[in-house]
Amino acid sequence: MTAPFVDPLAIMLIGLAMGTGIGAFYFFYAARGQKDQIASLVYPAIGIGLFDFMSGFYMSFAWPMKTFGVPYNMLFGDPLLMFGLLLIIGAVMIYKNVKLGIMPLLSVLLGIYVLDGAYSISALKLETGQNYITAMGLYIFDAIGAILVPIAYFKPEERKSGAIKYMYYVEWIILGIGTIFALVIGYLALYGHLSSPP
């Protein structure tokens, strides 16, 4: 007898949380001028970025959750795919020490997509109750975090406090809150799947 298939959403959410957590600590370390700590994020970012990209690709194109009645392939799979890709690109750019170019602007475009997803969740009533609150928290904080990535064009001055440094800390907090929402949803999904498999 084979075990019933349970969708991979739980681990995808944990992968998303790991990715946004890496992004959050990039801004934290950058605000403090800790270049060695930023360099230490490169390999985890590439690894988690690959996982998020492949997970998003699988959800977007194989669509393992047809019975849910909600288009999670567009709502979650597509932005996860693009997030993983941007995480890899960002890590390679840091590793190669090249200028940011348009990369932060690509993050803004993804943030707008995620913000549109948040609006759709509410307007189309795709989630209800506790799921609505956590989903909206995840989408809104991740969208704002993605839209604020262009602050990376401005470098905080070492050993000085200023608006740019504070903005880096604000971005760290926003991405950190998004990370917590992803972890909460992922851990609750794991428990739910284990307690009532299909």
What are these regions (language model features)?
Residues A39-F51, L80, P104-D116, Y168-G178:
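Transmembrane alpha-helical segments of multi-pass membrane proteins
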Residues V70-I144:
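Membrane-proximal helix-loop-helix units in multi-pass membrane proteins
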Residues Y29-Y43, Y95-M103, K155-M167:
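Membrane-interface helix-boundary motifs at transmembrane edges
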Residues M1-F61, Y191-P198:
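N-terminal topogenic module of multi-pass integral membrane proteins
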Residues I121-P198:
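Terminal transmembrane helical module of multi-pass membrane proteins
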Residues G21-F28, G49-M65, L86-I94, G111-K125, ...:
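Hydrophobic alpha-helical transmembrane segments and adjacent interfacial helices
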Residues F61-F76, G162:
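A cross-kingdom feature marking solvent-exposed beta-strand/loop segments within repeated
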